[in-house]
């Protein structure tokens, strides 16, 4: 019955709030179509004019787009710019006393940072990096930090002096941190002693110590530690230095480095299907332009708005919509330390009420969890300040969408269901809150200037209602520029599978369906990446970790639907010598494998289900038939062609286990 209700609700069309639409930047579909037409008529002129109007340049660019070495595209060639200057300095004349950042700590502490204060702190931090740690333009700096204001200072300080920052999510294990440090060949690592989570200290420095032990990261010269929770920690003499003790001795004046448009701004590591994380490389100018434009178009950001994106800065959403996008627009951005559930599940709604949040951006996983923990909890708070709601990271189901729309938005806020990726830098497909009629769980239309299409493997367009591969058929300014140190992997990952008019196009790895009106609905991953609570986890990485258990011979991991997390991890495990285990042993083995995953990858990687099988279904070339295993895990009929299997009896044995468990 619930499924029928969801399907019926998903067909409904919700028009933008009329009062909101009247004052929106893009007020109706005619204006949207005019922008799309303008971009289609003269693609380079469209992007060039936006770059001239929206960004502050030290030296103008002389060419909008250089495609000579495609797919290594260059945007705004020979222009000189600085991201930190665009996010801070240019606002000082009119907004120096405006609040740039509102910070609320887990333990109730509170901090307000004006643009003038932000300018001072970023400059002092930049001088500290230059003068005391010899960080220069092009050096890589790893930031392993929690959600505190100093994390933003570090990002902007790196941007100011031309260093390339790479943020590693603070929930990642020492091993995952070590891999990223070594791949980036980082010179400096910045962390905090710890943070607070669920009302208790959560330590980070010990993870850094473990990552660096035994000279495991030879490129690292020094470590900079921010004192946050003041718990006693160990220091390595000559390597570890305390930020809080040094930064105030630095000058608050630091001239921004003149950066080329195409110089790397940051690396952000994301899961790859081979198991080795990919260092996604983003540029200065193109990335910042799209961060600002999507804030203006998708969130209709206004000068007096308080904008809150709940993402961690360790993910691309935190980069673009906690830091760079809001600050490029001169807006006020909120930063929250800790979890949604401490001291109770009303924390987020209290924050929206207290800080008069106008635009609120979060994940479907968070929405589902808050819905499950207190369907009517939001009714205790005044959420009338909200004007736009947004979702990110994964498709949102109709039930969660409906609750978000009705209970959080009071049936008056547009929901911008955004589709994009680490590699795209910013939104690609999204409703516009003042213009686009919306449907539950539908990303709707590509943004102006973006050529997103759903294609078959042969490059032809799918028919309405047919599932295909979501591709982007023209370059755009904020696109990934390379995989750090691995050009071949960049081409193989994104530009090697589907051609349109004889040229390879960007393959997103997501499946999608387009309807007769051009609206696009995202289905989910088509490759070996599982989206758990908005976090992309490579199945190869999970399999590699599980296989380290002494009892495991081999395994295969697939994603299955999860009502809270979006997707969960289901493992098919072959044990040593055909060993079998009873229920108690099975649960203990699951616990041990999850411990390994926590150590190797982080707590976000956790097996939800395990099936112990005698073997895995493989083709004669040795490839595991994952789609077949996914069908079994989801308890769907097997429709795959089994003729290529090396041993069809393996499938029969697995199916007999399924029947026994039922």
Curated annotation (Swiss-Prot):
Cofactor requirement: Mg(2+)
GO MF annotations in UniProt: acetate-CoA ligase activity; AMP binding; ATP binding; metal ion binding
One GO term describing the cellular component: cytosol
Function summary: Catalyzes the conversion of acetate into acetyl-CoA (AcCoA), an essential intermediate at the junction of anabolic and catabolic pathways. AcsA undergoes a two-step reaction. In the first half reaction, AcsA combines acetate with ATP to form acetyl-adenylate (AcAMP) intermediate. In the second half reaction, it can then transfer the acetyl group from AcAMP to the sulfhydryl group of CoA, forming the product AcCoA.
NCBIfam families, per the entry: Ac_CoA_lig_AcsA (TIGR02188), PRK00174.1 (NF001208)
EC number: 6.2.1.1
Lineage: Bacteria, Pseudomonadati, Campylobacterota, Epsilonproteobacteria, Campylobacterales
UniProt xrefs under Pfam families: ACAS_N, AMP-binding, AMP-binding_C
EC class: ligase
Cited InterPro entries: Ac_CoA_lig (IPR011904), ACAS_N (IPR032387), AMP-bd_C (IPR025110), AMP-bd_C_sf (IPR045851), AMP-binding_CS (IPR020845), AMP-dep_synth/lig_dom (IPR000873), ANL_N_sf (IPR042099)
Stated name of the protein: Acetyl-coenzyme A synthetase
A biological process term (GO) from this entry: acetyl-CoA biosynthetic process from acetate
Positions with a binding annotation for CoA: 197-200, 317, 533
Catalyzed reactions: acetate + ATP + CoA = acetyl-CoA + AMP + diphosphate
Membership in a protein family: Belongs to the ATP-dependent AMP-binding enzyme family.
The UniProt record lists the keyword Transmembrane: no
Posttranslational modification: Acetylated. Deacetylation by the SIR2-homolog deacetylase activates the enzyme.
Organism in which the protein naturally occurs: Helicobacter pylori (strain HPAG1)
Keyword list, A-Z: Acetylation, ATP-binding, Ligase, Magnesium, Metal-binding, Nucleotide-binding
Domain of life: Bacteria
Binding site for Mg(2+): 549, 552
Binding of ATP, residues: 393-395, 417-422, 510, 525, 536
Residue(s) carrying N6-acetyllysine: 623
